Amino acid sequence: MRYDVVIAGAGPTGLMLACELRLAGARTLVLERLAEPVDFSKALGVHARTVELLDMRGLGEGFQAEAPKLRGGNFASLGVPLDFSSFDTRHPYALFVPQVRTEELLTGRALELGAELRRGHAVTALEQDADGVTVSVTGPEGPYEVECAYLVGCDGGGSTVRKLLGIDFPGQDPHMFAVIADARFREELPHGEGMGPMRPYGVMRHDLRAWFAAFPLEPDVYRATVAFFDRPYADRRAPVTEEDVRAALTEVAGSDFGMHDVRWLSRLTDTSRQAERYRDGRVLLAGDACHIHLPAGGQGLNLGFQDAVNLGWKLGATIAGTAPPELLDTYEAERRPIAAGVLRNTRAQAVLIDPDPRYEGLRELMIELLHVPETNRYLAGLISALDVRYPMAGEHPLLGRRVPDLPLVTEDGTRQLSTYFHAARGVLLTLGCDQPLADEAAAWKDRVDLVAAEGVADPGSAVDGLTALLVRPDGYICWTAAPETGTDGLTDALRTWFGPPAM
């Protein structure tokens, strides 16, 4: 069987991409080198923009049902929470969702939609030509080949797909070296000088340029991190042992606090790298395969998730033959600058969490700035991805920005705009008047849904004064209309983002 898309990697990025591709009708195979799902969670939360995207695909309730809401974001553990409440969002918070649970929910959805998932199958080689990609795979029963139109590497920072393509992964080497343990502790952890509200337990050692910080994962289980700066690991390839963590705790905090029942051990650095390019012909990269960074502010999983939602509808339309020729190129053009921005802000945070006394003045100044509403909002927009704006033709300030989840007044009552995106199609939203827009957009009705609303239930929304919006499947506004503009530019926007009209 020839697949439309093969995805290497069944982490959150690969699984969400599989869901998006199946909604577009693409025959999708996910290959995961690990034989079983992992039982530990590197990432622990989803930010506001990711929650919005989950709502748009009908997945929001599953994530929110059991997840605590974190109302304040975190920047460099400086103790001043980021305020999400100033954004026009129904979700001014992050959700505390362990990555294990995120992957469970996304796996279930991908399989329900018809994606095929093979665990214990590793990509080992690839060859591509103008017609497709041949992927060499090693599975439990030996090597075999898979044919597909496109291959997407969602296989992490050490991406095999990226290496097979020979794509450079330039960036900055680490100066922070940490060990992590998810464990129980018999002794009370020190409250002292922690790392802000998200890490209420901790010890800062300016003399050692080191710190210990911990936060609860569940009752009596904590994630403990001990970080040293400019003190490289003796052997970075060696697995972390309990003794490594005990020794680090004792050196920095004076005790290992009776650490026991260890669930997970790992290393952490502030290495930051970005792939030189995200695409080579019919092979693309997404998620950690094209960017890695210090996991400060919980941005990594969310960055990859949003890569998947940006890429999925574009690749699906390309496979369906409805996409304009340049559409797939906009994936890298839009997402690469966003990832570069995340690398910049995490590099800045890496300096701010370094306890070197030389940086104390910088930390104090940054704390003052975080109390300035405009600065706080700017950083909250970065961390949550609520303030992303893609390059878009036109002058209206909403172009290229996410559409808020508006409560629409319809003939059937009030309904949230997000519910119209469950099928991952474009939406032409009219507010009070749908003619002649419906006629002009009729030739795209196989790709774009017309949603006619009488208006918005909440006064003072971001769309006040507009009569219509064209919104891409990923929730970003690509055309607006006001009474004075009429339908000017609608056909051009439809062609740009959804291809030529149906015959």
Swiss-Prot record:
SUPFAM superfamilies: FAD/NAD(P)-binding domain. The keyword NADP applies. FAD binds at residues 13, 32-33, 44, 99, 123, 160, 288, 301-302. One of its GO terms (biological process) is antibiotic biosynthetic process. It catalyses: 5a,11a-dehydrotetracycline + NADPH + O2 + H(+) = 5a,11a-dehydrooxytetracycline + NADP(+) + H2O; anhydrotetracycline + NADPH + O2 + H(+) = 5a,11a-dehydrotetracycline + NADP(+) + H2O. It is an enzyme of class 1 (oxidoreductase). The keyword Secreted does not apply. Its cofactor is FAD. Its EC number is 1.14.13.234, 1.14.13.38. Involved in the biosynthesis of the antibiotics oxytetracycline and tetracycline. OxyS starts by catalyzing the stereospecific hydroxylation of anhydrotetracycline at C(6) position to yield 5a,11a-dehydrotetracycline (12-dehydrotetracycline). If the released product is captured by OxyR, it is reduced to tetracycline. However, if the released product is recaptured by OxyS, it performs an additional hydroxylation at C(5), producing 5a,11a-dehydrooxytetracycline, which, following the action of OxyR becomes oxytetracycline. Belongs to the PheA/TfdB FAD monooxygenase family. PANTHER family: BINDING MONOOXYGENASE, PUTATIVE (JCVI)-RELATED, TRK SYSTEM POTASSIUM UPTAKE PROTEIN. This is 12-dehydrotetracycline 5-monooxygenase/anhydrotetracycline 6-monooxygenase. It comes from Streptomyces rimosus subsp. rimosus (strain ATCC 10970 / DSM 40260 / JCM 4667 / NRRL 2234). The gene is oxyS.
